[in-house]
Amino acid sequence: MAVVWSVVTILLGYAVLDVADAAPGVLTLRPLPPPAPTEYVATRTLPLVPQPTPATSVAEPLPPLAGETAAPSPTGIERALAAVRAVPALRDSALVVRDGQSGDVLLDQRGDELRIPASTTKLLSAAAIGRAFAPGETLRTVVREGDTPDEIVLVAGGDSLLAPGRGDPRAVAGRAGLGDLADQVASALRARGTRSVTLYVDETYADGPRTAPTWASTFRSSGITGAVAMLGLSSQRARGGAAGPADPVLSVRTAFAGLLDARGLAVKVAARGRAPGAPGSPMPTPMPTPTSGSTPQTATDSTATPTTSAPTTGPGAVLGSVESAPVQEQLALALTDSDNALTEILARQAAYRSGAGTAFAAVGAWVVSQVAALGLDTAGVTLSDASGLSRENRVRASLLSDVLVLGYDGRHPVLRRALDGLPIGGLTGTLADRFTGADHVAAGRARAKTGTLTGANALAGSVVDDDGRLLVFVGMVAGVGTNDARAALDRLVAAIASCGCR
């Protein structure tokens, strides 16, 4: 009977958002997305948990809640959360609860302490990445002529989600297809009578190290993260227990050569090195970057003109090209699956386009600078990567709440779109298996980014309370076992969801 009630409560909780037009579903005339798999982020001492294949798409974006309901009071929140805050796992935690519409702080417990954020770092990275790419902007993978008629150059343009065959216009992972690119190139070469070519790869766009020096050596080999590269196949995304390739670019090159061979071309693969006609360090035209204290972006997806990003690395004619899903959709997918490599790939490109370095620490510093440019207080905040795998990262719960409020209150539409990719409690992504027990009241009502490293656990997102009010929460727990920390944080969110708290 308890299981039945849990299922019923999950469905009723999701229906609350659905009726309010705050979640996809039949009541909003939107199809429910397929549930994305759970991704666990392990570290040196945690056992690795095998995972299913990551999602290829994300849930439909959630529009703002309709109607005006009174916000909870700080006194009401204090009273409602008193019992859960007293549990051992949360006594020394950093907790912040805020009203999602006004941004008013309803609870602040050690919110200004610097803590290890784990994967909630991705919230800061999402805010920064959203400033560097135009709404609707895609990434273009190009093949062009080399210096001679029998040379072709595959130009890495930042798309790490290429389908190995045909592209799928409905997917985020696999929108652009390597097979489609091979069709174009083979057709162009046949039209001019070319039957034999040497294939080069131009890797100069946003190139950098594959893994960070502050990561555990087992992170890539165990599938916690993939290698960070500006070309990759959607079929080779890393997942816990199943590692991706050590060199994604090499995998793409080999696959593309095979596709051309299957289309009747004799292909010789060139050794690694500088591609014909490629400059030493191509730099695409950077997006205008607002300065610190300036007004946040206000362009919306519906009014912006989509653009395509591709490095220009030589005078050779283009023989074929394919375009990725919009960057904002890739960013949402990275949040849904807590995809460490994809987050790093997008952040590195964003930093590179802005003129920053491509080393992990340089990208982390760039993320902090962009968050500061949004007018948020980043004093003392340090990031050694963009994904949150580094234990050297330090962030305040109050800053994470600032970023969430900025996304939800309408001041930063691109960030809001990214936040639509946050997992839904009990339903999708890294929250698919949470809020399914005694805390099921938050199932379907909470969206949050998880964070898990040994001795450092976090949960940051939003939840709709019993009065239909959107509230933002951040919880950061240190020195507690992962299971105890997760249970306590889930109980905290459930208490917020159950609260009118006026």
Q: PLM features: residue spans?
A:
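Hydrophobic single-pass membrane-targeting/anchoring helices
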Residues: M1-P35, A42, V197
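A small/polar active-site loop signature that marks catalytic segments
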Residues: A227, S234-R416
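Beta-lactamase-like hydrolase cores
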Residues: A36-E113, P135, A182-G193
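Short, well-structured active-site flanking segments
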Residues: A132-T148, V269-A270, L415-A418
